[in-house]
Amino acid sequence: MKIFKQLSFLALLLSLTSCGGGGVDPKNPKSKEFELYIDYWNTQGTNPQITFDAVNSSPEVKIDFSQTFAGIAVPPNYTNVIIDNVRIIDANDVNYQIDGITAYEWREELDNWKEDVEFTMNYTQVQDLSVIMVLDESASLGEDFEKVKQYASSFITNVLAEIPNARIGIVDFADQIHSFPATNNKAALINYIASLTQGPFTTLYESVNLGIDMLEDMDAEAKVLLVFTDGTDNNSDPEFTPTYILDRLNNTTSDVKITSFTIGLEGKGGVDKPVLTEMAANGGSTAFPKNADELGKVFLKFSSSIANVYNLTYVRNQQVVPDSDKRKLRFVIKGTAKND
């Protein structure tokens, strides 16, 4: 009970003294600190596991907090727990690159947190990225459709500039659904987008389902679905419902979960906000720009957020830690805004 009171008190202090997820460095206003709280145990010395404390962790840290991550033993006397597909994104869709992580462990005898220099949290930016763009090309977009194609092309350019080996595929839809296979050939992708033409109706859910199929067939460390629409589905087969799509996103058949980002252009007033918000799953974000100019900014921010993804690795020894006496861990993540 004492630990949880301390944690609550610390969380209160942080909320009163910080902006957003953490403190701001006065010498670098783009730099902030974010916090991740973890429970750790290792019942046999070779089977480390962690769960997350979502209540005290900074909301900007985008992880699937419902997961329990299991690790492995590494000779001669180490264990590694990999936390994959981590992003730092604030409420304004500003993405942060990770500059460093400091580890702390709650020490009962000190009644305080103690910095840990032996057990560390390492981080690497993911370079093996697969993205499927699901793009609405319905007639309701009107003249804005040419801007959508421009923004989608810029998105491709930005992602490939950050990760040259990233593979990007396209699903485009109106009354018909078409697709372009994933590749890192920028010219081929942009030429395909330039060839898109508008049509009637909105086959949204079926198109998202195809995008999930494409991602599940791909091998990658990180998989992302980017969905853009300006309307609600009115042309998919009845089996393709929001519930069906959400179930597929949350129960993918591949080892890597799909992170989904959704954009609903509000100009025509027809987007289904609750559905698109739920569809932004597994650490993704959603945005509802009110016009084409705002839409361009969203595509730009999402290109940075999607490309800037990390795998974290918690390194510790093989000491037995019973699940009845889990270690309370705190990680302070220093990050710099990339796209504000």
List PLM regions with ranges.
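C-terminal motif of bacterial Sec signal peptides marking the signal peptidase cleavage site
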Residues: 15-18
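Acidic, polar low-complexity linker/tail segments
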Residues: 20-28, 72-132, 139-146
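Acidic/polar, low-complexity intrinsically disordered N-terminal segments immediately downstream
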Residues: 22-76
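DG-centered beta-turn motif at the end of beta-strands
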Residues: 135-137, 148, 170-173, 211, ...
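Von Willebrand factor
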Residues: 176-223, 233, 264-272
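VWA/integrin I-like adhesion module and closely mimicked acidic/polar interface patches used
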Residues: 231-282, 294, 300-301
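C-terminal "exit" segments of structured domains
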Residues: 288-340
